[in-house]
A protein has these predicted regions:
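Active-site-proximal alpha-helical scaffolds that flank and shape metal-associated catalytic sites
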Residues: 189-261, 285-296
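A structural feature that tracks compact, well-ordered secondary-structure segments
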Residues: 156-160, 174-175, 234-240, 252-255, ...
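Alpha-helix boundary/capping motif
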Residues: 3-5
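Short amphipathic alpha-helical segments with heptad-repeat character
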Residues: 144-147, 151, 174-177, 181, ...
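Carboxylate/His-rich catalytic cores and anion/metal-binding grooves
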Residues: 166-196
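Helix-loop elements that line ligand-binding/catalytic pockets
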Residues: 252, 264-274, 291
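Amphipathic, well-ordered alpha-helical segments in soluble domains
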Residues: 149-156, 183, 229-236, 263
Length: 401
């Protein structure tokens, strides 16, 4: 392999895809831009693995915007979270070192065991080049879903600002809108500049976002986005943060998680106060939504579109994924944050418990959500310290060379 082959990309062929290495000319341009401190300009459309039916998606909504004329009225728990959100704003251009490259053999440096078809006959038949393509595409697919989900969170949180009746919740939701914009920016840049490959939104994730946005009740936006989508995203981010060997991948997810832990706490605080006021019928409707949403999120991680894009036998891959013990453990672990949150906000009727038992995730009910959120903050701060030490050491070495 040529020593300059340190960045990977995919070349689109018709409606499918074919992963290769970044051309030398493109590498020289990118290095010049890095030296000048400029971002690479590119169109997302040119990086999608398949043609889309347009670059826009409109979701019709019918809801009322709430104004409140009492401005000195707020729950201390939410106001405290709001102040924390203001203090912890950050700039992805300066906090993240974008000069770092990805490994062409394994961009994020993730264990192969986390690939859904690892150990399958399909995987075992592949040569190293084929496995490299799968690593690239699976990771790009996952980050693409993070990206689309973060845009969903951006839109949903803007809706919460309008809908939620309390001024304290409006204050915090406004800080989250900024957070989500930053997350979209960071994941978009990671895909554009480093992977140069983007997958469309998974249909299951798209369906849940659409259901969340179409519902006119303000609490359903919280429930669908703050609790379900952000909850499973936190668990997925955590796997990359904790297992990735690439420092760029680790830092992006660690810093996003620091914000997301606050977002889930926001949903918990708002809904925990509101749900005791619901009638049995209203609570049943929420529980049905949660059950359906959790099944959609579970099925989101099948990644059928990746196997199809790469020309692999989709039916054989699906059969393996459906019966893989490794994938069962992986998929259930993604609900480690959702289950205790659902219990905490008071949606813990027989329907929820049965569904969670059937999915094999009921055991997460005793999880310490607050403790997990605190750990997310600690990990992000520790990463800042380590990266600062590495940068200082490198600068000292350069000065004495």
């Amino acid at each position: 392999m040529h020593p300059d082959h340190h960045i990977i990309r995919a070349h689109k062929v018709s409606s499918c895809c074919n992963a290769g290495l970044l051309r030398p000319a493109s590498r020289r341009i990118q290095r010049t831009q890095k030296a000048q401190g400029a971002k690479t300009k590119m169109s997302t459309a040119s990086h999608y693995v398949c043609d889309l039916n347009g670059m826009d998606w409109q979701v019709a909504q019918d809801f009322e915007a709430n104004f409140r004329w009492e401005y000195d009225d707020g729950r201390e728990s939410l106001l405290k979270l709001y102040r924390k959100g203001k203090r912890q704003q950050w700039d992805s251009d300066t906090r993240i070192d974008w000069s770092q490259d990805l490994d062409p053999e394994n961009p994020a440096g993730m264990p192969d065991e986390m690939i859904a078809i690892y150990g399958s006959p399909v995987w075992n038949r592949l040569d190293e080049k084929g496995r490299t393509r799968i690593r690239h595409h699976v990771q790009a697919w996952q980050i693409s879903q993070f990206l689309h989900g973060e845009q969903g969170a951006l839109v949903c949180t803007a809706k919460i600002v309008q809908q939620v009746p309390g001024i304290d919740a409006k204050f915090y939701a406004a800080t989250q809108v900024m957070d989500e914009a930053r997350h979209v920016e960071a994941f978009s840049r990671l895909l554009h500049e480093k992977y140069e490959l983007v997958y469309p939104i998974n249909p299951y994730l798209k369906s849940l976002i659409e259901d969340t946005l179409r519902d006119s009740r303000w609490d359903m936006t919280y429930l669908g986005m703050q609790v379900l989508i952000e909850g499973v995203a936190l668990a997925a981010f955590g796997l990359i943060r904790d297992y990735a060997r690439n420092p760029l991948s680790k830092s992006v997810t660690a810093y996003v998680m620091q914000d997301e832990a606050r977002h889930v706490a926001f949903g918990r605080l708002a809904l925990r106060d509101y749900y005791p006021q619901l009638t049995d019928k209203e609570r049943d409707e929420r529980e049905e939504f949660v059950v359906e949403g959790c099944y959609l999120l579970r099925d989101r991680f099948l990644a059928d579109e990746v196997w199809e894009c790469l020309g692999l036998p989709v039916a054989e891959c699906k059969e393996w994924v459906d019966h893989s013990e490794l994938m069962r453990v992986y998929r259930t672990s993604l609900f480690s944050r959702i289950v205790p949150t659902i219990r905490d906000i008071g949606l813990w009727g027989p329907r929820i418990r049965k569904a969670y038992a059937d999915m094999g995730i009921l055991g997460f009910a005793e999880g310490d959500v607050e403790g997990m959120g605190l750990r997310d903050e600690v990990v992000a701060r520790e990463l800042d310290v380590r990266l600062a030490e590495i940068k200082s050491t490198a600068e000292q070495a350069a000065a004495t060379a």
